[in-house]
Amino acid sequence: MSTLKVDNLLLQNNNAGTGRILEVVSGVCDGRSITTMSGTYSLENVTAVQLLNTTYTAVTGSSITYTPPEGTKTVIYEFWSQIGAEDGADSICHSILYIDDVEVVSSRHAPSAYRAMNQTFKWPIQCNASADNTDVGSFTSWTSSKTLKIMARSYSTGYDQRYHNTRYWNGSGNTTQVTRPVLTITAIG
């Protein structure tokens, strides 16, 4: 049996074929930098629990400025985080994907956590659409940097939510245990 080990495999014609993963940017939001074919990307450093109130604010760790490689037809944005209730047993929030400070209306989510739960916010962004449609996150082309992030708020004062917090850890409740989020961008040709 033979083994081939390479650092990077690039097809001769990287624009041919469809449905291929062209690159993946993925990491724990601890301030790391990730280098790919299309550039070097820095993830935010999440070191604290984030308490939401009733005003929309950027979710820490969710922001990335990204340019997909040539030949990309779809970019998949994926943000994994831990959410939980601030005071009572229940929490509800509203979260939305923004691209260059424009709301992707169809991406609206309203996750609710009883005490605490994992949340994955995942959204495909079309890069070769026949027309731009920011309501669903599609563009005729994507050749320069765009900033992607999640904006969120609590449903109301009685349902405040915390991001990046386990709520319970090692037999005790209402902890300040920080769970760092994971951000993943996948470019598909």
Question: How does the language model describe each region?
Answer:
Residues S2-L43:
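Glycine-rich, low-complexity segments
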Residues T36, T40-L51, T55-S62, T67-G189:
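Terminal beta-strand-rich extracellular "head" domains
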